Amino acid sequence: YKRQTVGQAVTILMRMLGYKDEDIGGIWPDSYMAEAATVGLTEGVSTNGSAGLTRAQAARLFLNLLRTQTKEGGTTFASTLGQTVQGVLLSADTEGGEGRLRLSTGTYTLTEGKASNGMLNGMKGTLIVDSKSGRALTFVPEDLGSSKTVVLASAKATEMTDTSGNTYTVKSDTQVFQNGEASSWGEAYTWLNA
Protein backbone atom coordinates (compact mmCIF):
# COMPACT_ATOMS: atom_id res chain seq x y z
CA TYR A 1 0.00 0.00 0.00
CA LYS A 2 1.43 3.33 -1.07
CA ARG A 3 -0.23 6.49 0.19
CA GLN A 4 -1.39 8.84 -2.55
CA THR A 5 -0.29 12.46 -2.47
CA VAL A 6 -2.41 15.58 -2.72
CA GLY A 7 -0.64 16.33 -6.03
CA GLN A 8 -1.59 12.96 -7.51
CA ALA A 9 -5.24 13.40 -6.51
CA VAL A 10 -5.35 16.96 -7.85
CA THR A 11 -3.81 15.82 -11.16
CA ILE A 12 -6.47 13.12 -11.60
CA LEU A 13 -9.30 15.54 -10.80
CA MET A 14 -7.90 18.26 -13.09
CA ARG A 15 -7.87 15.71 -15.92
CA MET A 16 -11.49 14.86 -15.12
CA LEU A 17 -12.20 18.58 -15.60
CA GLY A 18 -10.65 18.35 -19.08
CA TYR A 19 -7.14 19.69 -18.44
CA LYS A 20 -4.08 18.07 -20.05
CA ASP A 21 -0.36 18.40 -19.38
CA GLU A 22 -0.01 20.84 -22.28
CA ASP A 23 -2.66 23.10 -20.68
CA ILE A 24 -0.79 23.23 -17.39
CA GLY A 25 2.94 23.39 -18.16
CA GLY A 26 5.56 23.90 -15.47
CA ILE A 27 6.91 21.36 -13.02
CA TRP A 28 4.65 18.66 -11.61
CA PRO A 29 2.98 18.68 -9.09
CA ASP A 30 3.42 22.41 -8.41
CA SER A 31 1.98 23.48 -11.76
CA TYR A 32 -1.13 21.33 -11.30
CA MET A 33 -1.55 22.60 -7.74
CA ALA A 34 -1.30 26.22 -8.91
CA GLU A 35 -3.86 25.77 -11.69
CA ALA A 36 -6.16 23.82 -9.35
CA ALA A 37 -6.04 26.71 -6.87
CA THR A 38 -6.91 29.13 -9.69
CA VAL A 39 -10.07 27.20 -10.63
CA GLY A 40 -11.08 26.59 -6.98
CA LEU A 41 -10.43 22.85 -6.84
CA THR A 42 -8.10 23.04 -3.82
CA GLU A 43 -10.22 25.45 -1.74
CA GLY A 44 -9.89 24.33 1.89
CA VAL A 45 -7.15 21.77 1.11
CA SER A 46 -3.42 21.96 1.83
CA THR A 47 -1.54 23.22 -1.21
CA ASN A 48 1.49 21.01 -0.55
CA GLY A 49 1.31 18.65 -3.52
CA SER A 50 3.88 16.24 -2.05
CA ALA A 51 1.99 15.71 1.21
CA GLY A 52 0.08 12.49 1.81
CA LEU A 53 -3.63 12.72 1.03
CA THR A 54 -5.95 12.37 4.03
CA ARG A 55 -9.54 11.13 3.81
CA ALA A 56 -10.79 14.59 4.77
CA GLN A 57 -8.77 16.17 1.96
CA ALA A 58 -10.02 13.59 -0.54
CA ALA A 59 -13.63 14.27 0.47
CA ARG A 60 -13.12 18.03 0.19
CA LEU A 61 -11.45 17.67 -3.22
CA PHE A 62 -14.37 15.62 -4.56
CA LEU A 63 -16.87 18.12 -3.18
CA ASN A 64 -14.91 20.95 -4.80
CA LEU A 65 -14.76 18.95 -8.05
CA LEU A 66 -18.55 18.86 -8.23
CA ARG A 67 -18.66 22.68 -7.87
CA THR A 68 -15.79 23.46 -10.27
CA GLN A 69 -16.24 24.62 -13.86
CA THR A 70 -14.94 22.26 -16.54
CA LYS A 71 -12.08 23.45 -18.74
CA GLU A 72 -14.54 24.35 -21.50
CA GLY A 73 -16.38 26.57 -19.00
CA GLY A 74 -20.04 27.37 -18.68
CA THR A 75 -20.85 24.19 -16.78
CA THR A 76 -19.81 22.63 -13.49
CA PHE A 77 -18.52 19.09 -13.28
CA ALA A 78 -21.71 18.17 -11.38
CA SER A 79 -23.82 18.97 -14.43
CA THR A 80 -21.85 16.44 -16.50
CA LEU A 81 -23.15 13.69 -14.19
CA GLY A 82 -26.86 14.37 -14.69
CA GLN A 83 -29.55 16.98 -14.31
CA THR A 84 -28.89 19.56 -11.59
CA VAL A 85 -31.61 21.06 -9.41
CA GLN A 86 -30.97 24.10 -7.20
CA GLY A 87 -32.83 24.36 -3.91
CA VAL A 88 -32.90 24.01 -0.16
CA LEU A 89 -32.89 20.48 1.28
CA LEU A 90 -35.90 20.54 3.57
CA SER A 91 -35.91 16.94 4.77
CA ALA A 92 -34.56 13.47 4.13
CA ASP A 93 -36.58 10.40 5.00
CA THR A 94 -37.17 6.76 4.17
CA GLU A 95 -40.59 5.55 3.13
CA GLY A 96 -41.27 1.99 2.04
CA GLY A 97 -37.54 1.22 2.10
CA GLU A 98 -36.68 4.03 -0.33
CA GLY A 99 -34.78 7.14 0.64
CA ARG A 100 -36.29 10.46 -0.38
CA LEU A 101 -35.03 14.02 -0.40
CA ARG A 102 -37.56 16.83 -0.20
CA LEU A 103 -36.20 20.05 -1.64
CA SER A 104 -37.84 23.44 -1.88
CA THR A 105 -38.32 22.59 -5.58
CA GLY A 106 -39.81 19.10 -5.25
CA THR A 107 -39.33 15.60 -3.82
CA TYR A 108 -36.81 13.14 -5.30
CA THR A 109 -36.25 9.44 -4.67
CA LEU A 110 -32.65 8.46 -3.94
CA THR A 111 -30.76 5.97 -6.06
CA GLU A 112 -31.73 2.43 -5.06
CA GLY A 113 -30.12 1.27 -1.83
CA LYS A 114 -29.17 4.78 -0.72
CA ALA A 115 -30.44 6.72 2.29
CA SER A 116 -29.68 10.09 3.83
CA ASN A 117 -28.95 10.69 7.51
CA GLY A 118 -30.47 14.18 7.38
CA MET A 119 -27.25 16.00 8.28
CA LEU A 120 -27.65 18.35 5.31
CA ASN A 121 -31.26 19.27 6.10
CA GLY A 122 -31.77 23.02 5.87
CA MET A 123 -28.80 23.59 3.60
CA LYS A 124 -28.95 25.28 0.21
CA GLY A 125 -27.26 23.47 -2.64
CA THR A 126 -27.48 21.43 -5.82
CA LEU A 127 -29.14 18.05 -6.22
CA ILE A 128 -27.68 15.83 -8.95
CA VAL A 129 -30.35 13.67 -10.57
CA ASP A 130 -29.60 10.68 -12.83
CA SER A 131 -30.88 11.64 -16.29
CA LYS A 132 -32.00 8.07 -17.06
CA SER A 133 -33.69 6.94 -13.84
CA GLY A 134 -34.76 10.34 -12.48
CA ARG A 135 -33.37 9.33 -9.08
CA ALA A 136 -31.22 11.56 -6.90
CA LEU A 137 -27.51 10.70 -6.97
CA THR A 138 -26.25 13.19 -4.39
CA PHE A 139 -26.84 16.59 -2.83
CA VAL A 140 -23.96 19.08 -3.00
CA PRO A 141 -24.28 21.81 -0.34
CA GLU A 142 -23.14 25.32 -1.14
CA ASP A 143 -19.72 26.16 0.19
CA LEU A 144 -20.38 27.70 3.58
CA GLY A 145 -17.44 28.73 5.71
CA SER A 146 -14.35 26.64 6.23
CA SER A 147 -13.23 23.63 8.18
CA LYS A 148 -10.12 22.58 10.03
CA THR A 149 -9.22 19.19 11.42
CA VAL A 150 -7.51 19.18 14.83
CA VAL A 151 -6.66 16.61 17.47
CA LEU A 152 -8.60 17.61 20.56
CA ALA A 153 -6.79 17.89 23.88
CA SER A 154 -9.68 19.29 25.95
CA ALA A 155 -13.12 20.86 25.66
CA LYS A 156 -14.84 23.42 27.88
CA ALA A 157 -18.24 25.09 27.75
CA THR A 158 -16.86 28.03 25.72
CA GLU A 159 -13.72 26.70 24.07
CA MET A 160 -11.72 23.73 22.88
CA THR A 161 -7.96 23.27 22.83
CA ASP A 162 -5.99 21.14 20.38
CA THR A 163 -2.83 19.14 21.09
CA SER A 164 -0.70 21.99 19.70
CA GLY A 165 -2.06 24.31 22.40
CA ASN A 166 -4.27 26.35 20.05
CA THR A 167 -7.54 27.46 21.65
CA TYR A 168 -10.77 27.90 19.68
CA THR A 169 -13.71 29.88 21.08
CA VAL A 170 -17.07 28.17 20.60
CA LYS A 171 -20.45 29.77 21.38
CA SER A 172 -22.61 27.54 23.55
CA ASP A 173 -25.49 27.71 21.04
CA THR A 174 -23.35 26.53 18.09
CA GLN A 175 -25.12 23.62 16.40
CA VAL A 176 -23.26 20.31 16.59
CA PHE A 177 -24.16 16.75 15.71
CA GLN A 178 -23.53 13.95 18.18
CA ASN A 179 -24.30 10.42 17.01
CA GLY A 180 -26.36 11.87 14.15
CA GLU A 181 -28.55 14.01 16.42
CA ALA A 182 -28.60 17.82 16.38
CA SER A 183 -27.59 19.45 19.64
CA SER A 184 -25.79 22.57 20.87
CA TRP A 185 -22.13 22.84 21.84
CA GLY A 186 -23.20 23.73 25.39
CA GLU A 187 -25.07 20.43 25.69
CA ALA A 188 -22.66 18.18 23.83
CA TYR A 189 -19.10 19.30 24.62
CA THR A 190 -18.79 17.07 27.69
CA TRP A 191 -18.81 13.85 25.65
CA LEU A 192 -15.59 15.00 23.95
CA ASN A 193 -13.69 14.78 27.24
CA ALA A 194 -14.99 11.30 28.07
Task: Tell me what each language-model feature is.
Residues 2-159, 165-167, 184-190:
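N-terminal propeptides
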Residues 174-175, 181-194:
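Short, intrinsically disordered, charge-balanced linker/junction segments flanking boundaries
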